[in-house]
Swiss-Prot record:
Keyword line: ATP synthesis, ATP-binding, Cell membrane, CF(1), Hydrogen ion transport, Ion transport, Membrane, Nucleotide-binding, Translocase, Transport
Membrane spanning stretches: none
Protein name per Swiss-Prot or TrEMBL: ATP synthase subunit beta
Membrane topology: Peripheral membrane protein
Family statement: Belongs to the ATPase alpha/beta chains family.
Record field: catalytic activity: ATP + H2O + 4 H(+)(in) = ADP + phosphate + 5 H(+)(out)
Record note on quaternary structure: F-type ATPases have 2 components, CF(1) - the catalytic core - and CF(0) - the membrane proton channel. CF(1) has five subunits: alpha(3), beta(3), gamma(1), delta(1), epsilon(1). CF(0) has three main subunits: a(1), b(2) and c(9-12). The alpha and beta chains form an alternating ring which encloses part of the gamma chain. CF(1) is attached to CF(0) by a central stalk formed by the gamma and epsilon chains, while a peripheral stalk is formed by the delta and b chains.
Length: 483
């Protein structure tokens, strides 16, 4: 009898608050004076809907005064009623960390979706998702290239190891495919650990990604965290932080180099805008939240290299209506070390990855970092492609015959370069029937230098379509000409 009474008293002490208002994903909770939970604390409330009990997690967003707090629900609030008892967990949302997360799928709250035995296991270490970025004296100042084996990236927009890379593009130009390819290449070539955060994207894509990674044998080195389109804005706003927290553990505790993939960072911004509106804040430009730059900075500043280890981040950035002046992609630009723009006009030519070499950038494409020869070849390639672009109006109006002999050669080389910048991907093998290819950086520089020098001017353009290195070009040439 005494034990039962003690349990009841303990439960009453823990259940300190009660729901006073529910408007969609916004839940106002009243707590006794002096017992208000801190901002970002996770609260729990039991909900019964159609005889099914579930626990809804609320995150504290505002202190309203008069012992009231405003929270954002991390699950649908169907069945939640006024007066429901609310428990303060006294800590923020936390996720499991360590090797146990590899090969599994989690939601933003750290619940494993494919193996429920991992849930509520006290032996598994958990970290809160709201963390401070590394201090200034912990940061790594060295700059190093991350070789991907993808020609167009390694030559013209080299990625920084421990940097932040943005994959920009509208709908359907190949952002997710390029991210899947990078996960595969990192697992195969570097045996590295990857964390994938699916932010507000299609549930079908998440399922396909999980099955494809399992099929290709790279799932055991990857942790996946999803907060998809059908989930409340609070989940979509926090899932990127959940994935980042898992990556930080591998970097800080296991001293690993980690790749963090975020698909799609625009949905993170979009979810923040929804939450801001729900909380009653005055919107800023184009309806986005006034705290857009701050929220982006909180996420991006934690993605960095510390001494001896790194988090390299690839972030897909959906560009609304292909408008790069939109505040969401424009705010993201400020944090990136390299930008890879995927262009619909290049995709329409059947060239994949559809990277626009003239608008994609990298801060390390300079002689002091990549070397004189790499830099010179990249500038020659860009120069030829730029000249070809300038000549397109003349060609469209007057035709190729009106060009000078020098310009005709430039256009011909540009067309070969455009096709050779395409490449067959490992993740696309089952669609194209062509095996994926990894081209070392030195081979890439050699190949494009020879194309710029005119060594392949007598080769037909078809010999350069979507191939790997020069060996593939030679084989295609022999097949086309019968020589």
């Amino acid at each position: 009898m005494t034990t039962a009474l003690e349990e009841q008293n303990a439960q009453q002490a823990a259940t300190a608050g009660r729901v006073v208002r529910v408007i969609g994903a916004v839940v106002d909770v009243e707590f006794p004076r002096g017992e208000l939970p801190a901002l970002y604390n996770a609260l729990t409330v039991e909900v019964t809907l159609e005889s099914v009990k579930k626990t809804v997690v609320l995150e504290v967003a505002q202190h309203l005064g008069d012992n009231l707090i405003r929270t954002i629900a991390m699950a649908p609030t169907d069945g939640l009623v006024r007066g429901a008892a609310v428990t303060d967990t006294a800590r923020p949302i936390s996720v499991p960390v360590g090797d146990v997360v590899k090969g599994h799928v989690f939601n933003a709250l750290g619940d494993c979706l494919d193996d429920v035995s991992l849930n509520n296991n006290p032996e598994i270490e958990r970290w809160g998702i709201h963390r401070e970025p590394p201090s200034f004296d912990q940061l790594e100042g060295k700059t190093e290239i991350l070789e991907t084996g993808i020609k167009v990236i390694d030559l013209l927009t080299p990625y920084v190891k421990g940097g932040k890379i943005g994959l920009f593009g509208g709908a359907g130009v190949g952002k997710t495919v390029l991210i899947q390819e990078m996960i595969t290449r990192i697992a195969r070539e570097f045996s590295g650990t990857s964390v994938f955060a699916g932010v507000g994207e299609r549930t079908r894509e998440g399922t396909d990604l999980f099955l494809e990674m399992e099929e290709m044998g790279v799932l055991q080195d990857t942790a996946l965290v999803f907060g998809q389109m059908d989930e409340p804005p609070g989940v979509r706003m926090r899932v990127a932080l959940s994935g980042l927290t898992m990556a930080e553990y591998f970097r800080d505790v296991q001293n690993q180099d980690v790749l963090l993939f975020i698909d799609n960072i625009f949905r993170f911004t979009q979810a923040g805008s929804e939450v801001s509106t729900l909380l009653g804040r005055m919107p800023s430009a184009v309806g986005y939240q006034p705290t857009l730059a701050d929220e982006m900075g909180v996420l991006q500043e934690r993605i960095t290299s510390t001494k001896g280890r790194s988090i390299t981040s690839l972030q897909a950035v959906y560009v609304p209506a292909d408008d790069y002046t939109d505040p969401a992609p424009a705010t993201t630009f400020a944090h990136l070390d390299a930008t890879t723009e995927l262009d619909r006009s290049i995709a329409s030519k059947g060239i994949y990855p559809a990277v626009n070499p003239l608008t994609s950038t990298s801060r390390i494409l300079e002689p002091a970092i990549v070397g004189e020869r790499h830099y010179e070849v990249s500038q020659r390639v860009i120069g030829i492609l730029q000249k070809n672009k300038e000549l397109q109006d003349i060609i469209a109006i007057l035709g190729m015959d009106e060009l000078s002999e020098e310009d005709k050669i430039t256009v011909a080389r540009a067309r070969r370069i455009e096709r050779f910048l395409g490449q067959n991907f490992f993740v696309a093998e089952k669609f194209t029937g062509l095996p994926g290819s990894y081209v070392p950086l030195t081979d890439t520089v050699d190949a494009f230098e020879r194309i710029c020098n005119g060594d392949f001017d007598h080769y037909p353009e078809q010999a350069f379509n979507g191939l790997g290195g020069l060996d593939d070009v030679e084989a295609a040439y022999k097949k086309l000409t019968g020589k």
